[in-house]
């Protein structure tokens, strides 16, 4: 699509009389940019990472917010920054203390990657946070979304920050039926967003898309179209198909495992072991456990292999543990 005026189009060229906006992707999204920014500035939530905004604070918040709800992150974020207020402190904190600060947020590799990236910043940039999208993107554990958040929010660089909220908003505005689980679809949406970023408000525009998806253009049910500042530009709304977008194919079936968990206790002490440094729940502590159901005799034999001699074996009630790491 080309949105232009006073122009002549031939197979070889486009001649334009006066400077105009040329949109090769989505004219609807281009037209939505200004009202989205105005709406965001008037309606944005008061969040701790939006106060005294700098690269380090935004970085920590964006990593914490991956796969985690805003309300759950708030107390962790404030406690984390109080103890680790800058890159140097994060680079030097012992891993056990770092994981204790992160305890309860899950996806612990996020914390390890933060520490490793902080070391990169100290080593390669003298402790000063890098200021270009490409340099930020090279930090350990920093993908296109996180780099695309820091670059425009802090340094006003016109790069897209496309997360699940933005995928939902853009696919609804454009009625894009591509599967959002595919990397190619995310790349396509990133290009659409990047093309229409207002040069004078890259941070607010990116945040407006995220904010709209978080509080208005909701998933899993009816979106609040009556509160949307761009509903008249939304093709899905025009078609009455808001809940048909985004399109996402079903995820793989869950794997179910049955294990026997052994809680070896001696007065006030309990035996735990550390998981391998790589793989599922890497480096985390756990109770010894084995696949399948162990009999009393097998528990005693397994304990002896660990250098323990159970005196009494007491069965515990069955329990279910679900996680998505």
Regions flagged by a language model, labelled:
Residues 16-26, 34-35, 39-226, 230-239, ...:
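Catalytic cores of DNA base-excision repair glycosylases
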């Amino acid at each position: 699509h080309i949105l232009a005026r006073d122009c002549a189009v031939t197979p070889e060229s486009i001649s334009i009389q006066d400077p105009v906006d040329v949109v090769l992707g989505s004219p609807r999204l281009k037209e939505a940019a200004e009202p989205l920014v105005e709406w965001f500035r008037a309606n944005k939530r008061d969040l701790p990472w939006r106060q005294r905004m700098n690269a380090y604070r935004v970085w920590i918040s964006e990593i914490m917010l991956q796969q985690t709800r805003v309300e759950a992150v708030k107390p962790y974020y404030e406690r984390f920054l109080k103890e680790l207020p800058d890159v140097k402190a994060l680079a030097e904190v012992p891993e056990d203390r770092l994981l204790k600060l992160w305890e309860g947020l899950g996806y612990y590799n996020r914390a390890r990657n933060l520490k490793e990236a902080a070391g990169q910043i100290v080593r390669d940039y003298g402790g000063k946070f890098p200021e270009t999208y490409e340099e930020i993107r090279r930090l350990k554990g920093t993908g296109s979304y996180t780099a695309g958040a820091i670059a425009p929010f802090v340094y006003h660089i016109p790069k897209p920050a496309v997360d699940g909220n933005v995928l939902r908003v853009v696919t609804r505005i454009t009625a894009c039926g591509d599967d959002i689980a595919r990397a190619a679809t995310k790349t396509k949406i990133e290009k659409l967003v990047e093309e229409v970023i207002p040069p004078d408000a890259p941070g607010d525009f990116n945040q407006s898309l995220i904010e709209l998806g978080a509080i208005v253009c909701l998933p899993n049910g009816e979106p609040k179209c009556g509160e949307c500042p761009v509903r008249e530009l939304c093709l899905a709304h025009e078609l009455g198909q808001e809940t048909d977008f985004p399109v996402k194919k079903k995820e793989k079936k869950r794997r179910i495992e049955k294990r026997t968990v052994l809680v070896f206790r001696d007065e006030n002490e309990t035996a735990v072991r550390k998981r391998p440094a790589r793989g599922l729940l890497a480096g985390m502590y756990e109770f010894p456990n084995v696949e399948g159901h162990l009999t009393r005799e097998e528990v005693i034999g397994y304990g002896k292999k660990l250098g323990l001699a159970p005196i009494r074996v007491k069965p515990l009630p069955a329990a279910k543990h679900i996680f998505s790491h």
